Curated annotation (Swiss-Prot):
Homology family: Belongs to the bacterial ribosomal protein bS20 family.
HAMAP family (alphabetical): Ribosomal_bS20
Gene3D superfamilies from the UniProt entry: Ribosomal protein S20
Name of the protein: Small ribosomal subunit protein bS20
Keywords for the protein's UniProt record, in alphabetical order: Ribonucleoprotein, Ribosomal protein, RNA-binding, rRNA-binding
Gene that encodes the chain: rpsT
Biological role stated in the UniProt entry: Binds directly to 16S ribosomal RNA.
Molecular function in Gene Ontology: small ribosomal subunit rRNA binding; structural constituent of ribosome
Record Pfam families: Ribosomal_S20p (PF01649)
A Gene Ontology BP annotation from the UniProt entry: translation
């Protein structure tokens, strides 16, 4: 433990900030996990709702420096891609179950 009064104060402040940041970081991780859980369950509407709740929180904490801005962007990008892929997969499954074969349009050469 520090002997100087200002060093003691800084140690107390540092510990207080560490605990606060740990709880905020945990909250961000929880919101991200909720989106992944909704995606894995296959419920697109729940995934979109969870993503809409997660996005402003992850942006806010990236601006404040709690997580890196590139990490926030990476999570948003990956989750958006997975949510968008859910609709394509469900469309293919629906058409196959109806007996229709879905073919992507051919690109002109």
């Amino acid at each position: 433990m520090a002997n100087i009064k200002s060093a003691k104060k800084r140690a107390i402040q540092s510990e207080k900030r560490r605990k606060h940041n740990a709880s905020r970081r945990s909250m961000v991780r929880t919101f991200i996990k909720k989106v992944y859980a909704a995606i894995s369950s296959g419920d697109k509407k729940a995934a979109e709702t969870a993503f809409a709740q997660m996005q402003p929180i992850i942006d806010r904490h990236a601006c404040k420096g709690l997580i890196h801005k590139n990490k926030a962007a990476r999570h948003k990008s990956n989750l958006t891609a997975q949510i968008n892929a859910m609709s394509e997969d469900s469309l293919l499954k629906k058409r196959r179950s109806e007996g229709c074969e879905f073919k992507a349009p051919e690109k002109p050469v």
